[in-house]
């Protein structure tokens, strides 16, 4: 990554923030969890307390509302689910062009792993982190780490 890419990433990050996140049961649309917090801040590990029933759902709809001052040509994210630091799952999502000085909502559906691959909540609790890297094309904007606790 060249210095121009780095300065572009820094410029975008300064004007980028997550306003809220919502997780819904993808089948019923019912809200499972909502947090009005900027999870994009890269300087510390965030925490989320999510109802344990999320582990029983076939699919979860994730809604991210974010604001940006800078435009982005190809906004995308790479999301890794880690258990005790080891990658369990990895997903790639692409939103595309995002205009300058806008607030946007991005909704995507995440399907559950097969039941045979699921671990109980007591094993997962506090041991799972979600590492999300936000990009404009190949330029890293920010990286967020959220530790999950099941309640």
Curated annotation (Swiss-Prot):
Main location: nucleus
InterPro entries attached to this UniProt entry: Ig_E-set (IPR014756), PDED_dom (IPR008015), PDED_dom_sf (IPR037036), Rhodop-sen_GMP-Pdiesterase_dsu (IPR017287)
Compartments it resides in: Nucleus; Cytoplasm
Record keywords, A-Z: cGMP, Cytoplasm, Nucleus
Pfam families noted in UniProt: GMP_PDE_delta
GO cellular component: cytoplasm; nucleus
GO biological process, one term: sensory perception of light stimulus
Gene3D superfamilies: GMP phosphodiesterase, delta subunit
Coiled coil: none
Statement: the UniProt record of this protein carries the keyword Cytoplasm: yes
Record's subunit section: Interacts with Pde6.
Protein family: Belongs to the PDE6D/unc-119 family.
Protein name: Probable cGMP 3',5'-cyclic phosphodiesterase subunit delta
Species in which this protein is naturally found: Drosophila sechellia (Fruit fly)
Taxonomy of the source species: Eukaryota, Metazoa, Ecdysozoa, Arthropoda, Hexapoda
Gene: PrBP
């Amino acid at each position: 990554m060249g210095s121009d890419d780095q300065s572009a990433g820094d410029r975008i990050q300064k004007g980028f923030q997550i306003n809220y996140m919502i997780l819904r049961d993808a089948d019923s649309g019912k809200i499972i969890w909502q947090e009005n917090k900027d999870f994009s801040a890269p300087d510390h590990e965030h925490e989320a307390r999510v109802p344990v029933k999320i582990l029983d759902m076939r699919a979860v709809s994730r809604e991210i509302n974010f604001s940006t001052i800078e435009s982005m040509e190809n906004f995308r994210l790479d999301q890794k689910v880690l258990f005790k630091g080891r990658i369990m799952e990895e997903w790639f999502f692409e939103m595309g062009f995002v205009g300058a000085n806008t607030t946007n909502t991005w909704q995507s559906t995440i399907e559950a792993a097969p039941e045979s691959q699921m671990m109980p909540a007591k094993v997962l609790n506090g041991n799972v982190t979600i590492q999300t890297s936000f990009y404009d094309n190949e330029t890293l904007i920010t990286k967020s780490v959220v530790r999950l606790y099941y309640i």
